[in-house]
């Protein structure tokens, strides 16, 4: 029997048992080793703010439809997209994957999972990389996608608003792309880690700094060439708009919830011809769509880790036993100043 995390109601975490069915000939069974919790998307389901819980998403017309029907209802099972596991069983015709291979991917906070051989083959983790870092494959792909949307040029100043897990990764990638990165957050610990891990050249605490004015003073009153917003806060988006140069770009990567209060679109946005670009992993920059699919994004990020070009060890703040998943979600929800990447540990389950 396997076990999976379930949200039975907002802020209520439980578990369900499920059967481990026999394998088909080209399938592989994985035992989960670690699973990372997303502080953005997953917390929207945990808190009950996710729009799928309140409206119906029409995938054909790509519209959220108000009404009595919703796309999700509690209990919500199987959430989680930052997993890494070990191969423990092979189908009779599997040739390209071996027992004990480590596979990264997305299968939710569950103890076991079955994948096709091709899925596992495409996501074999380098032996040189500690297994726990496999949890970053998907969020790393999201970060690369956002940096691609930004179209950073060497020598540009990039302001990253929100130095949580995703912001830390975006900052490292932006610096690798030749940018000077200004990291912005309201939690001092995150700013310290951003400097330590190489995610920022300069940091600003938004709780005690007039960010837009400070960034302009750093750039001969020009403003940042690009701002990347990864908080999901409209207040941060407003500051990002205020911080960029005339005719510049803001990449909005955060998952905003509810109505957008705190935006003053008649001010800098209008007068400075600011372009806001939504960045989401379901699609890529149109110019790159032919060459960059999600698998390439994932594999590229894992290669950066294996080659030592990205340092994610400092951003793992908590490793918590899988059976204590409820406490892990509580920490992310109630103590964000203490938490970056929270990881569920299945190795003793």
Predicted regions and their residues:
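A generic structural signal for residues embedded in beta-strands
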Residues: 30, 105-106, 160
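A glycine-/small-residue-rich N-terminal strand-loop-strand element
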Residues: 68, 72-107
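Short, well-ordered loop/turn sites that connect or cap secondary structure elements
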Residues: 96-98, 152, 244
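Mid-domain Rossmann-like dinucleotide-binding core that forms the NAD(H)/NADP(H) cofactor-binding site
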Residues: 127-208, 213
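C-terminal substrate-binding/catalytic core of Rossmann-like NAD(P)-dependent dehydrogenases/reductases
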Residues: 212-217, 263-316, 327
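C-terminal capping/lid region of NAD(P)-dependent oxidoreductase domains
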Residues: 221, 251-252, 262, 274, ...
